[in-house]
Amino acid sequence: MRMNSMCAIMSLTDSSSKDLYPLTRLRPVAALPVAGRYRAIDFQLSSISHAGIDSVGIFIGGSGRSIYDHIRSGSAWGLESKLRGGIFTFSQTYLKQVMGDESFDENNFYVNHKEFLKKSLAKYVVVSGGKIVAKVDLQDVLDFHLANDGDVTLIYKNVPVEKVRNHPYEKVAVLEQDNKLQRLISSLDWNYPDEMVAHSLNMYLLPVKTLLDIIERADKEGIR
């Protein structure tokens, strides 16, 4: 294992996709075009590639066809399958939520998450959604995480309140004076005392072991 190596998980299950019907009826928000030639997912994959991450798990709520057709082998980002690593896609996670997982271990909602993380052999994992278009230096985020010795590092951006006010699917990071996260709340529940607000980019960095522990707790409590 390379010291401080990273893998990445992208969760393309954003509930706001329903507000973009019919565009997102058969595809996640991450597959929608941006500036004509790009897709929203391209920006996340570029940040992942530039950080030297070579193992990416993409979990898709519904059909993954639009994602498969676009990313193909991942060669555009240097993520084509090697001896170890590559892009691994897991679709129809919504169906697993509906069907339940009591009968067979292979139908367990989190089995693919756990298998991907363990086989990546990475020490840290970047977890993100797919709808935020942003350029993020994930190596800098890892350096920050290591320097501050936190459990989880949340990536956010200070933006004018108009960017998030009245957007029910956006999250505001409520920070303490030392910039440690106090809680995440819906943009509708924030009282906006200042002109700027810490807008969550729905990206996190944490140790793989910590995420596996979180998954185990969620599984025991029936959280999907």
Question: What are the language-model segments listed below?
Answer:
Residues R2-G85:
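N-terminal glycine-rich phosphate-binding loop and ensuing alpha1 helix
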Residues L12, G130, V208:
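Residues immediately flanking
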Residues I41, H145, P207:
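Residue-level signal for inorganic ion chemistry
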Residues G52-D54, L121, D149, K180:
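Short loop/turn motifs at secondary-structure junctions
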Residues G62, S128, L206-P207:
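A conserved hydrophobic position in a structured secondary element of the catalytic/binding core
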Residues G74-A76, E170-Q177:
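Short, hinge-like loop/turn segments at secondary-structure boundaries
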Residues R84-K171, A218:
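Conserved beta-loop-beta/alpha segment of the NTase-like Rossmann-fold superfamily
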Residues L175-R224:
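Catalytic-core segments of class I nucleotidyltransferases/pyrophosphorylases
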